[in-house]
UniProtKB/Swiss-Prot annotation:
It is found in: Mitochondrion. GO terms for cellular component: mitochondrion. The gene is MTERF3. This is Transcription termination factor 3, mitochondrial. Residues 1-64 form a transit peptide. Pfam families: mTERF (PF02536). It comes from Gallus gallus (Chicken).
Length: 405
C-alpha cells in the first residue's frame, strides 16, 4: 500500500478511536432506528473540533436492508438512565496525534503501487551517462542554459581540460552569480562577460575571497582600477594566479630586464600575458637576443620594453626575421633597437617590399643618405600608401611585380 493510503487509513483509525467511548446502548438504539444529527450527538461532551468528522457507522455495524430496529428495553427507568450515561475515554491530544503521524514509515523504492498511482508519476529525463559535448546537457542544466544566454560559447569551453565537468558541478545562483558580480566590479562589461568566461571558465570555480585578495594586491602595487580592468581583459587567466606568484613574476621582469618599478608596471599593463605565460620561453628569447643576435644588455632592455611581444615570440621566427633584416638587408643593431616593432611584422611582407624597392632602385635604409626609408615606413604603411609615397609607383606595378617572384 502506498504511503498516502496508509496515512488515510491511520487518520480514520485515530478519528474512530477518539469517539469510540461515546457510544452507549441508548445511542446504539438510536443509530439502529435512525441517525441523530452529529452536532446534537456531540453537544454534551465538548469535543475538540478534529473529532467532529466521525461517521455514525463507527457507532454501530450497519444492518441489512429491511432489518427491524432493536426492541425497546424493559428495564426500569433508573437502570436505563444509568446505562444511558456515556462512557468516555481519555482525550487524544494533538501531540499524540502528531506522534502517530510521525510513526508512518517512509516510502520505499521497492514498495508496490497501483497502476493508477504509477501513471501519475512523472520522471525527469535521464542525463546522458557520458558525452563528448556539453550540448547534450544544456536542456538538463539550468547553469549551462543561463551561461549560454550570457554569451558563453560552450563549444569552446568543452575544449579546455576539465572545464565542462566543472560547469556541470556548479549551481548558478549559489556559485556563479557572486563571481559575475565580482567581475563587474573589476570593470568587465556585461557584453564582455560571455567572451571572458569562454576564455577562462575556471574562474567560476575560484573562491571569491581569493579573487578579491589578488585584486587588492594589484592595487597595493599602485595599479589603478582602469589598468586592472585592462590587464584582466587582455589576460583572462591573470586572476587565477596567487599573490605570491604574481609578486614573483613582477620581480622576475624587473630584475631580468633591469627596469625600474614604473617601467615594469608599464610593461605588464601593455602586455599582461607576461604575468600568466611560462617563463622558460622568455629566458630563452633573452638569451637568443644577447648571444645569437649580438645585442647588448641595454639594447635588449629597450627592445623588450618597446615590443614586449618579442619575449614570447617563436625563436625560429625571430631568427629568420633577424637574419633577413641584418644579414641580407644590412640593417645594423642600433636601427633594429630603435624600431624593434619590425620583428612583429610578417617576414613575407618584408621580403616583398624590400625586393620591390631593389627592383626600383630605391632600397636605401641609411639615415645619413638621401631617399632614406625607415623600417617603420617599410612595414607599417598600407600597400597603396607604400606604393605611392615610398616606392613612387602604382599599385598595379607592385601587383605585377609580385607575380614575377
Amino acid at each position: 500500500m502506498a504511503v498516502w493510503a496508509r496515512q488515510v487509513a491511520r487518520c480514520g483509525w485515530l478519528r474512530a478511536a477518539g469517539l469510540l467511548g461515546l457510544r452507549s446502548r441508548s445511542g446504539a438504539a438510536r443509530a439502529c432506528c435512525g441517525a441523530a444529527p452529529l452536532p446534537a450527538l456531540l453537544s454534551g461532551h465538548r469535543l475538540p473540533p478534529w473529532r467532529l468528522r466521525v461517521s455514525v457507522d463507527y457507532a454501530q455495524p450497519s444492518r441489512a436492508k429491511g432489518e427491524a430496529c432493536a426492541p425497546r428495553s424493559s428495564l426500569p427507568v433508573a437502570v436505563k438512565q444509568e446505562q444511558a450515561a456515556p462512557e468516555t475515554v481519555s482525550d487524544l491530544s494533538a501531540a499524540k496525534l502528531c506522534e502517530d503521524w510521525d510513526d508512518v514509515p517512509p516510502s520505499s523504492a521497492l514498495e508496490e503501487i497501483s497502476e493508477e498511482e504509477a501513471v501519475k508519476i512523472i520522471a525527469d529525463p535521464l542525463l546522458p551517462p557520458q558525452s563528448s559535448t556539453l550540448r547534450d546537457y544544456v536542456d538538463h542544466s539550468e547553469t549551462l542554459t543561463k551561461l549560454v544566454h550570457l554569451g558563453v560559447d560552450l563549444s569552446q569551453v568543452e575544449k579546455r581540460q576539465k572545464a565542462g565537468q566543472l560547469l556541470l558541478t556548479l549551481d548558478f545562483e549559489k556559485d556563479i552569480t557572486k563571481i559575475l558580480l565580482f567581475l563587474k566590479d573589476v570593470g568587465i562589461e556585461d557584453n564582455q562577460l560571455g567572451p571572458f568566461l569562454t576564455k577562462n571558465p575556471y574562474i567560476l570555480g575560484e573562491e571569491l575571497e581569493a579573487l578579491e585578495t589578488r585584486v587588492a594586491y594589484l592595487k597595493s602595487k599602485k595599479f589603478g582600477n582602469a589598468e586592472i580592468t585592462q590587464m584582466v581583459s587582455r589576460a583572462p587567466y591573470l586572476l587565477l594566479f596567487s599573490v605570491e606568484r604574481l609578486d614573483n613574476r613582477l620581480g622576475f621582469f624587473k630584475n631580468e630586464l633591469g627596469l625600474s618599478v614604473k617601467k615594469t608596471k608599464d610593461l605588464v599593463i601593455r602586455f599582461p600575458r607576461l604575468l600568466t605565460g611560462k617563463l622558460e620561453p622568455v629566458k630563452e628569447n633573452l638569451q637568443v637576443c644577447q648571444v645569437e643576435f649580438g645585442f647588448e644588455r641595454n639594447e635588449v632592455q629597450q627592445i623588450a620594453f618597446k615590443t614586449p611581444k618579442i619575449l614570447t615570440a617563436s625563436k625560429k621566427r625571430l631568427r629568420q626575421t633577424f637574419d633577413y633584416l641584418h644579414n641580407i638587408m644590412g640593417i645594423p643593431h642600433n636601427m633594429l633597437t630603435r624600431f624593434p616593432q619590425v620583428f612583429n611584422s610578417k617576414l613575407l611582407r618584408i621580403k616583398e617590399r624590400h625586393m620591390f624597392l631593389i627592383f626600383l632602385g630605391r632600397a636605401q635604409y641609411d639615415p645619413t643618405k638621401p631617399s632614406y626609408i625607415s623600417l617603420d615606413q617599410l612595414v607599417s604603411l598600407p600597400d597603396e600608401v607604400f606604393c605611392t609615397e615610398i616606392a613612387k609607383a602604382s599599385m598595379q606595378d607592385f601587383e605585377k611585380f609580385l607575380k614575377t617572384i
